Amino acid sequence: MNGTLDHPDQPDLDAIKMFVGQVPRTWSEKDLRELFEQYGAVYEINILRDRSQNPPQSKGCCFVTFYTRKAALEAQNALHNMKVLPGMHHPIQMKPADSEKNNAVEDRKLFIGMISKKCTENDIRVMFSSFGQIEECRILRGPDGLSRGCAFVTFTTRTMAQTAIKAMHQAQTMEGCSSPMVVKFADTQKDKEQKRMAQQLQQQMQQISAASVWGNLAGLNTLGPQYLALYLQLLQQTANSGNLNTLSSLHPMGGLNAMQLQNLAALAAAASAAQNTPSGTNALTTSSSPLSVLTSSAGSSPSSSSSNSVNPIASLGALQTLAGATAGLNVGSLAGMAALNGGLGSSGLSNGTGSTMEALTQAYSGIQQYAAAALPTLYNQNLLTQQSIGAAGSQKEGPEGANLFIYHLPQEFGDQDLLQMFMPFGNVVSAKVFIDKQTNLSKCFGFVSYDNPVSAQAAIQSMNGFQIGMKRLKVQLKRSKNDSKPY
């Protein structure tokens, strides 16, 4: 141990134990001490050795503890990925030891917003010093050196930081500020990466929307796998972090409410957790367009789903083709989603593969359910606005063969919900959910009319049997007025 006159027998309370890799196996503690003492007094060095050899040989790594936290950070800044020691092929790796991660800087660092631009670092220190020892205080400044009205304050413990948040967040409005002071934990590197991904995805989706390729559901085939995979990756990361705000900020996901976001994030989390699950069904793919298979199989009825395994399983293979390459999702991963969704219940598949196939079908059904709610906002916004004017709540009929009867609608669905769900297939001239005049509650059925029969047929193909919650939609042509029954 280094017992210099400049330091007591023990290191400072906030000192960091650092792990150091990529050091020569021939180096002794003396050699390492000479290297590290350039940055500050060293309290202790512990070389990791292979005890199976006689005498024990160095593993080429060590732990070092400086007397001060400042010295450790200076050494890390100067050495980590910067300096290559004699005889080594890679630069030194230096980072806090695992035991130090519980007190990582990102867990103690606060962002302070809405502060007066007249405040100095000393003013901020005085303002927050009553909550504990401040390790660092820095005001953000522009190229001109003027304050941007925000700062970072790092305490020595997370408890101190939490106390400061409780006491100071929105506690006062400072001079020249339009709203109260903001005090919160600073964004971590993971938070920053998530925001960057969200911004990137939003830009890509806006470019797609501007291209006006969303005239009907067939336009989904123009959406590249990289966009869908990026969606899945973001969902998985967001679900694992528990932060749904990132999802709700996405333009294409604007049609989802909080509960749907949570369910969709849960599905993605299950996929992420199950990525290492071995599966014998990875060979399931489809020769046709992956997205066309996904959309066409959405129209299968409950009976056809249980008797014919081609559509849902081929669709899962297609989903694997789309997202597997970049997001690591495989068919085995999808099986892990089954527990999060009621799916097809216990009907299963009659191809003899048992519960695995049933789980896969349930998983597909779960994805399908929440993808439906997001679809409308993927379409050109100008088109949506034009269609929605006067269509919701109207009972105007289209030409023969263009009028649909929809049964098994969710109780909470209104005219606007019905309109948005069927707009992707063509120009909707009217969408009406029927209401019981006595109870003022939905009768769970309605009518949708298009301006052409082709759109109506596309809607039937994709939406008949489509699952929303615990219900499967029944979508069929409305009979002509000459028939004795309207449907």
UniProtKB/Swiss-Prot annotation:
The keyword Disulfide bond does not apply. It is found in: Nucleus; Cytoplasm. Residues 16-99, 108-188, 402-480 form the RRM domain. Its main location: nucleus. Residues 277-310 are annotated as: Disordered. The keyword Nucleotide-binding does not apply. It holds the Pfam family RRM_1. GO terms for cellular component: cytoplasm; cytoplasmic stress granule; male germ cell nucleus; nucleus; perinucleolar compartment; ribonucleoprotein complex. Residues 283-310 have a biased composition (Low complexity). One of its GO terms (biological process) is regulation of alternative mRNA splicing, via spliceosome. There is a cross-link at residue 109 (Glycyl lysine isopeptide (Lys-Gly) (interchain with G-Cter in SUMO2)). InterPro entries: CELF1/2_RRM1 (IPR034196), CELF1/2_RRM2 (IPR034198), CELF1/2_RRM3 (IPR034199), Nucleotide-bd_a/b_plait_sf (IPR012677), RBD_domain_sf (IPR035979), RRM_dom (IPR000504). The modification Phosphothreonine is found at residue 4. Gene3D superfamilies: 3.30.70.330. SUPFAM superfamilies: RNA-binding domain, RBD. Keywords: Acetylation, Activator, Cytoplasm, Isopeptide bond, mRNA processing, mRNA splicing, Nucleus, Phosphoprotein, Repeat, RNA-binding, Ubl conjugation. The modification Phosphoserine is found at residues 179, 303. The modification N-acetylmethionine is found at residue 1. RRM1 and RRM2 domains preferentially target UGU(U/G)-rich mRNA elements. RNA-binding protein implicated in the regulation of several post-transcriptional events. Involved in pre-mRNA alternative splicing, mRNA translation and stability. Mediates exon inclusion and/or exclusion in pre-mRNA that are subject to tissue-specific and developmentally regulated alternative splicing. Specifically activates exon 5 inclusion of cardiac isoforms of TNNT2 during heart remodeling at the juvenile to adult transition. This is CUGBP Elav-like family member 1. It comes from Rattus norvegicus (Rat). The lineage of its organism: Eukaryota, Metazoa, Chordata, Craniata, Vertebrata. The gene is Celf1.
